[in-house]
Amino acid sequence: MPKPKKTRREASHTSIMFDGILSSMAILNARDEEEVRKQFQQLNDPVKLVVFSQSLAAADLCAENEQLVREVAGLSDKISVEVLNLAIDRERAEAYGVDQVPALVVDGARDYGIRFYGVPTGYEFSNLIDAIIVASTGEPALTDETKASLAALAGPVDIKVFSTPT
């Protein structure tokens, strides 16, 4: 067996590379899983997490993203996962407006336009959990004041949040 080379270390995740094959331990620890299960008790309707990957483009990040999504989905029977290849499944990618990888679409009873590009770990992980809850319940956790401000907008708004690795 080839000698492993450590590729990177994060707070709760270690990736080991064996001649180009990514082998990973669990991303979520037991405490995280317990907390997410509690949060997922709020889920009403099914949610589909659509992962767009590509083996040649950002392969390590795509594998990590898919693993994280599968771990999260495993915490509720109301969450399913569909993995698509950006190059092969172009029509589906275009329908979702996805043009880069790794990408994650959070799709509930309707498509709220929630997309994550990159791996939603660190501070973005709580946003992923919130997005799943919103897609399932149809109710974002917003104050009445925020809802009134949003209702006053004259037209659609495209909000993009950028973050750096933590």
Predicted segment positions?
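Structural micro-motif
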Residues: 46, 90-114
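Non-catalytic, surface beta->alpha helical segment in thiol-disulfide oxidoreductase systems
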Residues: 105-139
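Catalytic cores of nucleotide-enabled group-transfer and carboxylate-activating enzymes in metabolic
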Residues: 46, 83-85, 101-104, 135, ...
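Thiol-based oxidoreductase modules, predominantly thioredoxin-like and allied folds used
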Residues: 77-89
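Polybasic, lysine-rich low-complexity intrinsically disordered segments
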Residues: 3-7
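Short, positively charged and aromatic/hydrophobic N-terminal segments
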Residues: 9, 13-23
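Local sequence-structure signature of Cys/Sec-based thiol-disulfide redox active-site neighborhoods
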Residues: 39-75, 152-166
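Long, charged amphipathic helices and adjacent flexible linkers at domain junctions
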Residues: 135-153
